Structure formats: C-alpha cells, structure tokens
C-alpha cells in the first residue's frame, strides 16, 4: 500500500485489461474511477470536481474516441492541468502527434509494456 494514494480515471473498454488495471492500482492503495466509454469519463470528470490525479485513456473506444475526448477537455479551462496518459494499441506517429498537441503528457503503446510497467508509468504522472 502506498503512502500517498492517488485517484486514477481509467478509460479503457477492454474488460479484461480494465479489471486487471483496477486490481493492480487498488492493490497499491489507489482509488480508481473506471469507465468503458469517453462519454462516461466526461461525466466522471464533472462529478469528481478536480479529484482526478491522472487519466489513463485508451484511444480506440466505442462512441467518442480518445482523440475526441482529448479535444473536448482541451478546450475547457477547468481541465487545463489534467494529466492524461494515452495507453493504446496504436503506435501511429500521427496519433501520437495529435494526442500530444491536445495536451496528453505521454503516449504509451500497450504492447511495449507488461501491465505492471504500464501501471507504474501512468502512476509516475499522478
């Protein structure tokens, strides 16, 4: 259990990965707000009133995708300091550039990391 628990908004539609990440983060003493769609993430950002330390964001989501989510929060003043880390299966340079241009602090390709390393990397931004 960590001494400084963080709140992570997990936006991941892969059910198995979502559950595994929630388990790993909660095991470390962190609070996880888990959603499967970007639209739900926008609702959680409002209801959490600035309590989110970092967002784990998948790009390929049903409905609103990760880039559209980033574009939406990028234009809102109250989210200008929100740290968003992209965790995607896509390693396309174009996607990386767009995501960083919209304020993502990092872009991680899921296949490049074991789950524990992904979790630690995202937590490093919290």
Where are these regions (language model features)?
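Conserved acidic carboxylate
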Residues: 12
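The feature encodes the CheY-like receiver
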Residues: 18, 62, 92
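Charged docking surfaces used in two-component/phosphorelay signaling
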Residues: 19-27
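Acidic, metal-coordinating helix/loop segments flanking the phosphotransfer/catalytic sites
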Residues: 34-54
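Acidic catalytic/metal-coordinating carboxylates
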Residues: 37, 65-71
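Active-site residues of response regulator receiver
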Residues: 58, 88
């Amino acid at each position: 259990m960590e001494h400084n628990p963080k709140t992570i908004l997990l936006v991941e539609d892969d059910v198995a990965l979502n559950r595994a990440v929630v388990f790993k983060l909660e095991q470390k003493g962190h609070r996880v707000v888990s959603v499967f769609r970007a639209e739900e993430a926008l609702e959680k950002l409002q209801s959490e009133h600035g309590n989110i330390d970092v967002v784990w964001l998948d790009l390929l989501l049903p409905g609103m995708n990760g880039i559209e989510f980033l574009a939406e929060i990028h234009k809102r003043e109250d989210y200008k300091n929100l740290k968003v880390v992209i965790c995607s299966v896509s390693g396309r340079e174009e996607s990386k550039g767009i995501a960083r241009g919209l304020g993502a602090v990092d872009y991680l390709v899921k296949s490049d990391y074991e789950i524990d390393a992904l979790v630690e990397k995202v937590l490093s931004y919290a």
